[in-house]
Amino acid sequence: MRKYLIIILLAVGLAGASAQRAMNRPYVDDKLVHFGFSLGMNFMSYSVVESLEPVSGRLDGGTFSNQILHARVSSLFPGFSVGFIADLRLARYLNLRFTPELHFGERTITYVSESGDLGKFSTDILCMPITFPLMLKWSADRESNYRPYVIGGGGVSYDFGQDKEKMVLQKPLDYFIQVGFGCDFYFSWFKLCPELKYQLGFNNALTPINERSEGISADADGFYTNAIKHLRSHMITLTFNFE
């Protein structure tokens, strides 16, 4: 992850250096409505509440019974995000934004038994949510060719990446809040806006094993799900907005 942060800081630094010239597009922020698009990366995770109830099942060709499993998200993998921007100017410093985005990512949940008999094992969850956030953007005064801002709001998401063959199945619908910050850099033909956001889901994203009618054997593989009581989604996105 450090490598990605270094690349990001270099890109932002170059953008800032380019912006320290004559004022570009001095009246662009006076437009009532404008549009754009975004490209970037994401890091998806869960907060996991364990059930701490004994589970049984089949693992690596053998069976086990009455084991208490601990689960956590073991790694963060970078994903890809692309989106559309619609911006409505409400006041000099305040804008209303609708920014639907499609995200491609992956989460890995790692399990370990309390007794230590089973060792570590994991399952991957491929995610492809489309988010529909409605955000308020508050901007500071413009300085030369840059203008920092903060942003916040909420919305709804729907995950199209469900794979019923996976050991853990995420519910497709979720509601979330989102906060972040960024900076507008003004160039001759467009604004480039690096933006960092954090998203927190409200719903329990876990599909209980008794609600799954196909895909896995509840008796043999249900322990992946039964070891968990609650999943709440988290996502960090870094996007470069072109407006």
Give the ranges of each region predicted by the language model.
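Predominantly the C-terminal beta-signal and adjacent terminal strand-loop region
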Residues: N24, P172, F185-E243
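Conserved C-terminal beta-signal and adjacent last beta-strands/turns
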Residues: S157, Q178-Y186, K191
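Gram-negative (and chloroplast) outer-membrane scaffold detector with strong preference
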Residues: P26-V33, M41-F43, I85-Q162, T237-T239, ...
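Short glycine/proline- and aromatic-enriched beta-strand/turn motifs that initiate or cap beta-hairpins
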Residues: A19-P78, M235, N241-E243
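Residues that define the transmembrane beta-barrel architecture of outer-membrane proteins
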Residues: K31-V33, L76-F80, L126-I130, Y146, ...
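Bacterial Sec-dependent N-terminal signal peptides
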Residues: M1-N24, F240-E243
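Flexible, solvent-exposed loop segments that connect beta-strands
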Residues: V49-V73, G105-I125, F160-Q170, L206-I228
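Short conserved catalytic/interaction loops centered on acidic-Pro-aromatic/His motifs
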Residues: Y146-R147, K164, V168, F190-C193
